[in-house]
Amino acid sequence: MPEPIRFHLDEHIDGAIADGLRRRGIDVTTTAGVALRGATDEEQLAFARAERRVMVTHDDDYLRLHQRGVLHAGIAFCRPQLRSIGEVLRSLILIWAVLSPEEMENHIEFL
């Protein structure tokens, strides 16, 4: 069985999303959980890449890093005002179910 996608949630993502993913057996870390609170976006993205985790964020700065050519393990991006927690959770579960880490590498999924 291929390796599943793993996620890293930045500090602005609601903790209920991490809880929902974990309840479904999906590997997820959070900024607070790995002591990266206050880290720069570049440091967050480097951590996620080193751990082969897709970065989940609403922060446009990650899109700019992608445009600048900064390598990453994938970005799942959404605007918080456009999606409910349940919608974001369902979208991440779908990404986890149908995409591989290789398919997400240096790719952005807009939720």
Where are these predicted regions, by residue range?
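Acidic, PIN/NYN-like endoribonuclease modules and their adjacent C-terminal/linker elements
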Residues: 1-11, 15-24, 36, 42-45, ...
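A short beta-strand-loop structural module common to alpha/beta enzyme folds
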Residues: 27-35
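Acidic, metal-binding active-site segment of PIN/NYN-like and related structure-specific nucleases
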Residues: 49-66
